[in-house]
Amino acid sequence: MTKTTMAVPGALLAAIALLSAAPAQAAAHRVTPGNWLYVTVTTGDARSSHISRLLTCDPPHGHAHAARACEELAAADGDITRIPPKRTFCPMIYAPVTADAHGEWNGRHVEYRHAFGNACGLEGETGAVFALSEQASDGPTPGLRS
């Protein structure tokens, strides 16, 4: 009987070890499947003045312009630097903004960070990806870029 009672605790310890390893393996897999980016826009140089959204593209969701942002990202194969810049005229007002994005597109890791002179320049270069406000933005004025 002593051998049987010793075998039961040993089996329980082995089962506990296996069960505790399962969550660690699950955490190693993707948290959000599909094409997604966690995007942040920081105004000025203060961390307290930032807005962030999780942009998902299957189906488009995350902010007011998610469908357009996903279309632009799809055309650029998830590379924000390949989004064609808009021909715009932006005011020469210095109001710095920084755009950050990280996530996954078609199984590839995406990292992006760039500082712009103002929000108009940000929208002109990155399209709808960082258009996080719920209201329609004034955005860049169509025309020639100076």
UniProtKB/Swiss-Prot annotation:
Chief location bin: secreted
Record's signal peptide: 1-26
Disulphide linkage map: 57-70, 90-120
Domain of life where this protein originates: Bacteria
Alphabetical list of SUPFAM superfamilies matching this protein: Subtilisin inhibitor
Xref: InterPro entries: Prot_inh_SSI_I16_CS, Subtilisin_inhibitor, Subtilisin_inhibitor-like_sf
PROSITE patterns recorded: SSI
Pfam families with a match to the protein in the record: SSI
GO MF term list: serine-type endopeptidase inhibitor activity
Gene Ontology CC: extracellular region
Localization (cell): Secreted
Keywords: Disulfide bond, Protease inhibitor, Secreted, Serine protease inhibitor, Signal
Family of this protein: Belongs to the protease inhibitor I16 (SSI) family.
Name of protein: Putative serine protease inhibitor SAV_2156
Protein's organism: Streptomyces avermitilis (strain ATCC 31267 / DSM 46492 / JCM 5070 / NBRC 14893 / NCIMB 12804 / NRRL 8165 / MA-4680)
